[in-house]
A protein has these predicted regions:
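Juxtamembrane helix-loop-helix connectors linking adjacent transmembrane helices
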Residues: 36-41, 69-143
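Short helix-terminus and kink motifs of transmembrane alpha helices
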Residues: 28, 32, 96-103, 146-147, ...
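N-terminal, membrane-interfacial amphipathic/helix-forming hydrophobic leader that caps
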Residues: 1-82, 93, 196, 211-259
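Internal alpha-helical transmembrane segments of multi-pass membrane proteins, especially GPCRs
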Residues: 14, 18, 83-86, 132, ...
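Transmembrane helix-loop-helix hairpins at the membrane interface
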Residues: 127-259
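Detector for Asparagine
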Residues: 24, 35-38, 62, 98, ...
Length: 259
Protein backbone atom coordinates (compact mmCIF):
# COMPACT_ATOMS: atom_id res chain seq x y z
CA UNK A 1 0.00 0.00 0.00
CA UNK A 2 1.46 3.33 -1.08
CA UNK A 3 1.82 6.36 1.17
CA UNK A 4 -1.12 8.17 -0.46
CA UNK A 5 -3.33 5.11 -0.06
CA UNK A 6 -2.39 4.78 3.62
CA UNK A 7 -3.21 8.46 4.12
CA UNK A 8 -6.63 8.05 2.46
CA UNK A 9 -7.33 4.95 4.53
CA UNK A 10 -6.51 6.78 7.76
CA UNK A 11 -8.76 9.67 6.73
CA UNK A 12 -11.63 7.29 6.01
CA UNK A 13 -11.21 5.56 9.37
CA UNK A 14 -11.03 8.89 11.21
CA UNK A 15 -14.27 10.02 9.59
CA UNK A 16 -15.88 6.72 10.58
CA UNK A 17 -14.64 7.11 14.15
CA UNK A 18 -15.89 10.70 14.22
CA UNK A 19 -19.34 9.45 13.19
CA UNK A 20 -19.43 6.99 16.08
CA UNK A 21 -18.25 9.62 18.56
CA UNK A 22 -20.85 12.11 17.29
CA UNK A 23 -23.51 9.39 17.48
CA UNK A 24 -22.83 8.69 21.16
CA UNK A 25 -22.42 12.35 22.14
CA UNK A 26 -25.75 13.16 20.47
CA UNK A 27 -27.46 10.39 22.46
CA UNK A 28 -26.06 11.67 25.76
CA UNK A 29 -26.99 15.27 24.95
CA UNK A 30 -30.50 14.31 23.88
CA UNK A 31 -30.99 12.27 27.05
CA UNK A 32 -29.85 15.16 29.24
CA UNK A 33 -32.16 17.63 27.46
CA UNK A 34 -35.23 15.45 26.95
CA UNK A 35 -34.86 13.48 30.20
CA UNK A 36 -37.30 10.72 29.14
CA UNK A 37 -39.07 8.76 31.87
CA UNK A 38 -37.74 5.43 30.53
CA UNK A 39 -34.46 6.15 28.69
CA UNK A 40 -33.98 2.54 27.57
CA UNK A 41 -37.38 2.51 25.86
CA UNK A 42 -37.17 5.87 24.08
CA UNK A 43 -35.88 6.00 20.53
CA UNK A 44 -36.00 9.79 20.25
CA UNK A 45 -32.37 10.35 21.39
CA UNK A 46 -31.29 8.00 18.61
CA UNK A 47 -33.06 10.20 16.06
CA UNK A 48 -30.61 12.98 16.92
CA UNK A 49 -27.72 10.50 16.96
CA UNK A 50 -28.43 9.30 13.42
CA UNK A 51 -28.76 12.92 12.26
CA UNK A 52 -25.36 13.75 13.80
CA UNK A 53 -23.79 10.71 12.15
CA UNK A 54 -25.18 11.60 8.73
CA UNK A 55 -24.09 15.22 9.14
CA UNK A 56 -20.46 14.13 9.62
CA UNK A 57 -20.62 12.06 6.43
CA UNK A 58 -22.25 14.95 4.55
CA UNK A 59 -19.47 17.32 5.60
CA UNK A 60 -16.73 14.79 4.78
CA UNK A 61 -17.94 14.08 1.23
CA UNK A 62 -18.45 16.16 -1.90
CA UNK A 63 -21.64 16.27 -3.97
CA UNK A 64 -20.31 13.81 -6.55
CA UNK A 65 -19.52 11.24 -3.86
CA UNK A 66 -22.90 11.78 -2.23
CA UNK A 67 -24.63 11.00 -5.53
CA UNK A 68 -22.43 7.98 -6.20
CA UNK A 69 -23.30 6.47 -2.83
CA UNK A 70 -26.77 5.66 -4.17
CA UNK A 71 -25.68 4.39 -7.59
CA UNK A 72 -27.61 1.33 -8.79
CA UNK A 73 -25.50 -1.29 -10.58
CA UNK A 74 -28.12 -3.94 -11.23
CA UNK A 75 -31.85 -4.44 -10.65
CA UNK A 76 -32.47 -7.51 -8.44
CA UNK A 77 -35.35 -9.84 -9.22
CA UNK A 78 -37.93 -11.03 -6.69
CA UNK A 79 -36.19 -14.41 -6.71
CA UNK A 80 -32.89 -12.73 -5.82
CA UNK A 81 -34.51 -10.86 -2.93
CA UNK A 82 -35.92 -14.18 -1.68
CA UNK A 83 -32.39 -15.60 -1.75
CA UNK A 84 -31.23 -12.74 0.44
CA UNK A 85 -34.08 -13.40 2.88
CA UNK A 86 -32.95 -17.03 3.05
CA UNK A 87 -29.43 -15.86 3.84
CA UNK A 88 -30.91 -13.70 6.61
CA UNK A 89 -32.61 -16.79 8.01
CA UNK A 90 -29.29 -18.63 7.93
CA UNK A 91 -27.55 -15.81 9.80
CA UNK A 92 -30.35 -15.81 12.39
CA UNK A 93 -29.81 -19.54 12.99
CA UNK A 94 -26.06 -18.96 13.33
CA UNK A 95 -26.80 -16.12 15.75
CA UNK A 96 -29.04 -18.39 17.83
CA UNK A 97 -26.45 -21.17 18.18
CA UNK A 98 -23.66 -18.67 18.74
CA UNK A 99 -25.66 -16.99 21.52
CA UNK A 100 -26.32 -20.35 23.18
CA UNK A 101 -22.64 -21.30 23.05
CA UNK A 102 -21.53 -17.93 24.44
CA UNK A 103 -24.09 -18.15 27.24
CA UNK A 104 -22.84 -21.64 28.19
CA UNK A 105 -19.25 -20.43 28.31
CA UNK A 106 -20.14 -17.35 30.37
CA UNK A 107 -22.25 -19.39 32.78
CA UNK A 108 -19.18 -21.50 33.48
CA UNK A 109 -17.62 -18.32 34.93
CA UNK A 110 -20.90 -17.31 36.63
CA UNK A 111 -21.55 -14.62 34.02
CA UNK A 112 -24.39 -14.08 31.55
CA UNK A 113 -25.11 -12.32 28.26
CA UNK A 114 -28.85 -12.92 28.44
CA UNK A 115 -29.71 -9.22 28.61
CA UNK A 116 -27.64 -8.50 25.50
CA UNK A 117 -29.39 -11.29 23.59
CA UNK A 118 -32.85 -10.13 24.64
CA UNK A 119 -32.13 -6.54 23.63
CA UNK A 120 -30.87 -7.75 20.26
CA UNK A 121 -33.78 -10.06 19.43
CA UNK A 122 -36.87 -8.72 21.18
CA UNK A 123 -39.58 -6.53 19.71
CA UNK A 124 -39.33 -2.79 20.29
CA UNK A 125 -41.65 -1.72 23.11
CA UNK A 126 -42.34 1.87 21.99
CA UNK A 127 -43.20 3.52 18.69
CA UNK A 128 -40.06 5.66 18.75
CA UNK A 129 -37.85 2.60 19.28
CA UNK A 130 -39.71 0.78 16.50
CA UNK A 131 -39.06 3.69 14.11
CA UNK A 132 -35.40 3.78 15.10
CA UNK A 133 -34.78 0.03 15.10
CA UNK A 134 -36.72 -0.72 11.93
CA UNK A 135 -35.91 2.29 9.76
CA UNK A 136 -33.43 4.87 11.07
CA UNK A 137 -30.82 2.41 12.36
CA UNK A 138 -30.66 0.42 9.09
CA UNK A 139 -30.56 3.63 7.05
CA UNK A 140 -27.87 5.30 9.15
CA UNK A 141 -25.74 2.17 9.49
CA UNK A 142 -25.86 1.41 5.77
CA UNK A 143 -24.94 4.99 4.84
CA UNK A 144 -21.93 4.81 7.17
CA UNK A 145 -20.66 1.26 6.67
CA UNK A 146 -21.67 0.43 3.10
CA UNK A 147 -22.24 3.89 1.63
CA UNK A 148 -19.17 5.67 3.01
CA UNK A 149 -16.65 3.19 4.44
CA UNK A 150 -17.09 0.35 1.93
CA UNK A 151 -17.09 2.70 -1.06
CA UNK A 152 -13.85 4.29 0.13
CA UNK A 153 -12.31 0.88 0.85
CA UNK A 154 -13.09 -0.35 -2.69
CA UNK A 155 -9.94 1.36 -4.00
CA UNK A 156 -8.00 -1.34 -2.12
CA UNK A 157 -10.05 -4.16 -3.65
CA UNK A 158 -13.68 -5.28 -3.49
CA UNK A 159 -12.95 -8.27 -1.26
CA UNK A 160 -11.05 -6.09 1.23
CA UNK A 161 -13.86 -3.52 1.19
CA UNK A 162 -16.59 -6.05 1.95
CA UNK A 163 -14.69 -7.94 4.65
CA UNK A 164 -13.14 -4.95 6.42
CA UNK A 165 -16.40 -2.96 6.47
CA UNK A 166 -18.15 -6.07 7.84
CA UNK A 167 -15.52 -6.38 10.59
CA UNK A 168 -16.05 -2.74 11.56
CA UNK A 169 -19.82 -3.28 11.44
CA UNK A 170 -19.47 -6.20 13.85
CA UNK A 171 -17.24 -4.25 16.24
CA UNK A 172 -19.66 -1.31 16.10
CA UNK A 173 -22.40 -3.39 17.73
CA UNK A 174 -20.20 -3.60 20.79
CA UNK A 175 -21.08 -6.88 22.47
CA UNK A 176 -20.02 -10.50 22.14
CA UNK A 177 -23.52 -11.68 21.27
CA UNK A 178 -24.23 -9.38 18.33
CA UNK A 179 -20.74 -8.93 16.88
CA UNK A 180 -20.45 -12.32 15.06
CA UNK A 181 -23.99 -11.97 13.68
CA UNK A 182 -23.37 -8.37 12.57
CA UNK A 183 -20.15 -9.44 10.83
CA UNK A 184 -21.93 -12.13 8.80
CA UNK A 185 -24.81 -9.77 8.04
CA UNK A 186 -22.26 -7.16 6.99
CA UNK A 187 -20.78 -9.58 4.45
CA UNK A 188 -24.20 -10.09 2.87
CA UNK A 189 -25.03 -6.38 2.85
CA UNK A 190 -21.59 -5.55 1.45
CA UNK A 191 -22.08 -8.02 -1.40
CA UNK A 192 -25.52 -6.56 -2.15
CA UNK A 193 -24.08 -3.02 -2.17
CA UNK A 194 -21.22 -3.69 -4.59
CA UNK A 195 -23.31 -5.94 -6.86
CA UNK A 196 -26.66 -4.13 -6.89
CA UNK A 197 -26.57 -0.87 -4.97
CA UNK A 198 -26.81 0.63 -1.51
CA UNK A 199 -30.58 1.13 -1.54
CA UNK A 200 -31.09 -2.63 -1.82
CA UNK A 201 -28.78 -3.23 1.14
CA UNK A 202 -30.86 -0.72 3.10
CA UNK A 203 -34.06 -2.56 2.10
CA UNK A 204 -32.66 -5.94 3.20
CA UNK A 205 -31.41 -4.45 6.48
CA UNK A 206 -34.86 -2.97 7.15
CA UNK A 207 -36.50 -6.31 6.35
CA UNK A 208 -34.18 -8.07 8.80
CA UNK A 209 -34.82 -5.63 11.65
CA UNK A 210 -38.52 -5.05 11.07
CA UNK A 211 -39.83 -8.41 9.84
CA UNK A 212 -37.46 -11.12 11.06
CA UNK A 213 -36.79 -9.43 14.41
CA UNK A 214 -39.70 -7.19 15.43
CA UNK A 215 -42.78 -8.49 13.59
CA UNK A 216 -41.86 -12.15 13.99
CA UNK A 217 -41.29 -11.71 17.73
CA UNK A 218 -44.69 -10.00 18.10
CA UNK A 219 -46.35 -12.76 16.08
CA UNK A 220 -44.80 -15.53 18.20
CA UNK A 221 -46.04 -13.85 21.38
CA UNK A 222 -49.58 -14.81 20.31
CA UNK A 223 -48.80 -18.46 21.03
CA UNK A 224 -47.66 -20.55 23.95
CA UNK A 225 -43.91 -20.91 24.44
CA UNK A 226 -43.78 -24.45 23.02
CA UNK A 227 -45.92 -23.59 20.00
CA UNK A 228 -43.93 -20.41 19.37
CA UNK A 229 -40.70 -22.42 19.44
CA UNK A 230 -42.07 -24.88 16.88
CA UNK A 231 -43.30 -22.11 14.56
CA UNK A 232 -40.04 -20.20 14.86
CA UNK A 233 -38.01 -23.34 14.17
CA UNK A 234 -40.06 -24.14 11.07
CA UNK A 235 -39.83 -20.60 9.66
CA UNK A 236 -36.18 -19.92 10.39
CA UNK A 237 -35.13 -23.51 9.69
CA UNK A 238 -36.76 -23.40 6.25
CA UNK A 239 -35.09 -20.10 5.45
CA UNK A 240 -31.75 -21.41 6.71
CA UNK A 241 -31.97 -24.50 4.50
CA UNK A 242 -32.73 -22.25 1.56
CA UNK A 243 -29.78 -20.09 2.58
CA UNK A 244 -27.44 -23.08 2.60
CA UNK A 245 -28.67 -24.15 -0.82
CA UNK A 246 -28.19 -20.69 -2.34
CA UNK A 247 -24.83 -20.32 -0.62
CA UNK A 248 -23.72 -23.59 -2.23
CA UNK A 249 -24.89 -22.36 -5.63
CA UNK A 250 -23.18 -19.01 -5.16
CA UNK A 251 -19.91 -20.62 -4.16
CA UNK A 252 -19.82 -22.73 -7.30
CA UNK A 253 -21.13 -20.21 -9.83
CA UNK A 254 -20.70 -16.60 -8.71
CA UNK A 255 -17.69 -16.28 -6.41
CA UNK A 256 -15.24 -15.75 -9.27
CA UNK A 257 -17.16 -12.67 -10.43
CA UNK A 258 -16.76 -11.07 -7.01
CA UNK A 259 -13.34 -12.30 -5.96
Amino acid sequence: MEKTERKDLKKTLWVGLSCLIAFNIAILQALSILNPENPDESGVPYFFAVAAELFIIFVATNKKTQRQIFDVYCQPTAAKFFQWVCFLGLTQIIFSYNSTLIEMLLNFFHLSAQNQEESATGANETLSMFIYGSFLAPFGEEILFRGFLLQNFKRYGVRFAIIFSAILFGIYHGNIVQTPFAFILGLLLGYITVSYGLKYAIAVHIFNNMVLADFLDRFLQLFSENTATIISTIIMGSLALGGLYYLYRFWHTQRQKLF
